[in-house]
Structure formats: C-alpha cells, structure tokens
Amino acid sequence: MAAIPHRDPYVDAVLPDGVSRIGDAAEPSRWFDHAHLAAHARDVDVVHLHVGYGQLEAAAMEAWSEELQRQGVPLVVTVHQLHAPGQPSSGSHDAHLAAVLGTAEVVLTLTPGAADDIAERYGRTAIVVAHPSVAVADPELGAERGLVGLRVGAPSPSVPDPVVLVRAALSGAVSGGGRLRLLVEEAELPALEPAFGAMADTGQLELAVFPAAEWAAQLQQLHVAVLSEQCGTHSRDVEVCRDVGTRVVAPSCGWFADQWSEVVPYSHDEHGRVDAVSLTAAIGAALARPMPRPADRVWRDGQRDAVRQVHAEVYAQVAGDRSWA
C-alpha cells in the first residue's frame, strides 16, 4: 500500500497489521510523478490518498487519477478537509476533490456530517470511520479547573483575526470564573502578535511557550481548550483532548461536534466571521461543566482496532478487484 502522505500520526494510526507501506517521505509524494507511478505500478496493490495534493493544479490531479486508472492501481481516498479555510474561493479545492473522488474505488471520511456533504456535493457514498486515538494521558500530569487554553502563533489565513478570538476567549474565561492561557509553539514565538505579549505583561492572561512534542501535555493541563481553526471537517486536536480529558470549544462550521459529545460549539463560519459573543458564551458554558475524564484506554484501543479492520477490508476488497491496465 502506498500512502500519501507516507507518514503522519493519523496515517500511522489506521495502518492495519500485516499491510506493508511502500515508498518514502518525500514531499510532494513521488507517487504523484507519472514516471515513478508507471515504473512501480506493479509493486503496489492500492494507493491511499489522505492529504498532500494541494500544491498540484486541479488539472494535474485529474491527469494523475486517470493515470492510476490506466495503470490499474486502485485509489482509496480519505476526505480530511471539505473546505479550504482562508482561501478567497473554494473552487480550486473543490476541483481537487472532484478529480480524485470521481475515480476513487472507495471513499472514507470521519464524521456522518462530512459523509452527507460528500454525497450531496460529489455523489459519492463515504464510509464513516472514527478518528483513532492519537495521544495517551500522562498519569502524573494534572489539570487546573477553570484554565482555558487557546493556541496562537504566526498569522494564518485560517485564523484571520486572532485578536478578536483572544479578547472573546479572555472575556469567556474571566466571566466563567477562570483564566486564559495562550499557547505558543516555540517556532512561532517570533511571529506572535505584539498585543498578546502586552496583555500578558499586564496580567490579563498567561503566555505558555512549548516545544511541539509537548502539545498533548499542554492540552491535558486545561479545563477547556478553544479551537481556533476557521472551518474544519474534523480535528485531530479534538481527539487529543478526548484522549487526555479536556473539554473542547470549537467552531460551529464543520463537524467537530460529530466527533465527540463533549464539544461545545461557537458560531464561526468558513469565511472567517467569528461571533465573539457566541465564543464568550460557549467558554462560560464549557467551564460550568465538569472536566471530562481521559478516554478509557481499553475502549480507545478497541476503537483503533476496529478502524484498522475497516481499512484492512477495504484494501483487500480493492486489491482483489484489481485488473491490470
């Protein structure tokens, strides 16, 4: 099986036992190169596309998917992102999806809402698989009741107005009897909005700078984690919070609430419009609820095994149906 990308926490988590992953971690994937694909078509039973194709033109994606068909290599697609946050138009992203979903043997996604959208927009039935566990709670690390965390960093199209988000989150944390901690990855500290440093200096909020490897630990220390991405189909951070026992406040745009019942939504659409009053209220509502317990490891392990079994059955099905071009 050739996975695109070759390695990723999600791709690793869903890989079934006994399935060999071939290729390397080159970016963009060598499997997008027609010559490489033709030379190695007989070495692979299935190509599984997750992400990593945004840098290609839509016409190139269409030509690539047609080349897979000519070579007789089945394509499996997991749809991770149905929208393109921060882009002025979703046309390019939609065209990419249309190109690969039109030729995929099997389509998967991670929430019922996303599957409904895929059916409506692209006429494909998607198999819904749960997002498997991606973190393990540290038994030595406690959480602070009332502590609200919001990740901030370099300017991003997916978070067009971070100052509005921070001020609304601060209002929600304080009105709910808590406090706000801004989480800043080390690599993004130089690009941090100066206003946030000033707010920390005056004691309005706390800044916590962390290395990327400690992200799950940072989330575990919170009562509430606020997700700031503009409009996601689903979120890995929701699953990390489920694993470590942190309540989530997430945008209403997308299907975050489909992932976990502990998600509290706030109004935020794919065009970057965030309702500050809604965010403040959502944080207050989340703080009024008890902190969830970390996910039961036996249940999460069983869920992961079931997800891997679905992938194993899909791979076996499409490989068995394969006919050489």
Where are these regions (language model features)?
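A charged, aromatic-enriched C-terminal amphipathic alpha-helix characteristic of glycosyltransferases
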Residues: 270-278, 284-325
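Short N-terminal targeting/anchoring amphipathic segment
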Residues: 30, 36-59, 76-78, 226-228
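Donor nucleotide-sugar binding/catalytic pocket of nucleotide-sugar-dependent glycosyltransferases
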Residues: 102-119, 123-138
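Membrane-proximal helix-turn-helix segments that form the acceptor-binding/catalytic region
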Residues: 63-74, 90-106
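Acidic donor-binding loop of glycosyltransferase active sites
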Residues: 217-233, 243-246
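Conserved catalytic-core segment of nucleotide-activated headgroup transferases in glycan assembly
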Residues: 145-204
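A short, histidine- and acid-enriched strand-loop-helix "catalytic/donor-clamping" loop
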Residues: 53-56, 74-90, 106
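Short hydrophobic beta-strand element within catalytic cores of glycosyltransferases
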Residues: 247-253, 257
